[in-house]
Amino acid sequence: MSATWTLSPEPLPPSTGPPVGAGLDAEQRTVFAFVLCLLVVLVLLMVRCVRILLDPYSRMPASSWTDHKEALERGQFDYALV
């Protein structure tokens, strides 16, 4: 009744998981491309926001704050009803 354990020279059976070289199916590729596009848009928006925060007046057109406006356009309503 002695049990002897010996190692067999046979290789182990392959694992039951997905193969290592398996590609993505069509739905996974579509989702991956969509997420990648969203990340690119997010990075572009972050860069734009940082540039605006660092120099806010360079993005503003000069004509909106340097031209001379009439009194009613500036908000001065003194004697407007006369």
Curated annotation (Swiss-Prot):
Its main location: membrane. Coiled coil: none annotated. InterPro entries: Cortexin (IPR020066). The chain crosses the membrane at residues 30-50. It comes from the Eukaryota. It is a single-pass membrane protein. It is found in: Membrane. GO terms for cellular component: membrane. Residues 1-21 are annotated as: Disordered. Pfam families: Cortexin. Keywords: Membrane, Transmembrane, Transmembrane helix. PANTHER family: CORTEXIN-1, CORTEXIN-1-RELATED. May mediate extracellular or intracellular signaling of cortical neurons during forebrain development. Belongs to the cortexin family. This is Cortexin-1. It comes from Homo sapiens. The lineage of its organism: Eukaryota, Metazoa, Chordata, Craniata, Vertebrata.
